[in-house]
Amino acid sequence: MLKPLGDRVVIELVQAEEKTASGIVLPDTAKEKPQEGKVIAVGTGRVLENGERVALEVAAGDRIIFSKYAGTEVKYEGTDYLILRESDILAVIG
């Protein structure tokens, strides 16, 4: 299990559409980079200058939208994940 540090979050990516609305199959090179994912794990929070730790606003299980080029892609046990900072998360879905 991946356990992020500090204000980082581990995201499982929601895969891009394989076909367009009109039924055209898209090759991998034409697919949009995903911006939606499911939070798998969260870090312990960020530390303020006074040493106080602030908990993250997202939790495991949340579906989120994040910045297009945010984070670092990693592959762990055959699954693709993205590790990013909480500040790169734009919204929680639902």
From Swiss-Prot:
Q: Name one GO biological process term.
A: chaperone cofactor-dependent protein refolding
Which keywords annotate this record? Answer: Chaperone, Cytoplasm
| Molecular function as annotated in GO | ATP binding; metal ion binding; protein folding chaperone; protein-folding chaperone binding; unfolded protein binding
The record ties this protein, via SUPFAM superfamilies, to: GroES-like (SSF50129)
- InterPro entries in alphabetical order: Chaperonin_GroES (IPR020818), Chaperonin_GroES_sf (IPR037124), Chaprnonin_Cpn10_CS (IPR018369), GroES-like_sf (IPR011032)
Which compartment or compartments is the protein found in? Cytoplasm
Q: Name one GO cellular component term.
A: cytoplasm
Keyword Cytoplasm in annotation: yes
Look up the coiled coil feature and give its residue ranges.
Answer: none
**Where on the tree of life does the source sit, at the highest rank?**
Bacteria
Major site of localization recorded for this protein: cytoplasm
PANTHER family, alphabetically? 10 KDA HEAT SHOCK PROTEIN, CO-CHAPERONIN GROES
Q: Which NCBIfam families does the record cross-reference, listed alphabetically?
A: PRK00364.1-2, PRK00364.1-6, PRK00364.2-2, PRK00364.2-4, PRK00364.2-5
What protein family does this chain belong to? Belongs to the GroES chaperonin family.
Q: What biological function has been recorded for the protein in this entry?
A: Together with the chaperonin GroEL, plays an essential role in assisting protein folding. The GroEL-GroES system forms a nano-cage that allows encapsulation of the non-native substrate proteins and provides a physical environment optimized to promote and accelerate protein folding. GroES binds to the apical surface of the GroEL ring, thereby capping the opening of the GroEL channel.
How it assembles, according to the record, is: Heptamer of 7 subunits arranged in a ring. Interacts with the chaperonin GroEL.
The protein, known as: Co-chaperonin GroES
Q: Provide the species name.
A: Bacillus cytotoxicus (strain DSM 22905 / CIP 110041 / 391-98 / NVH 391-98)
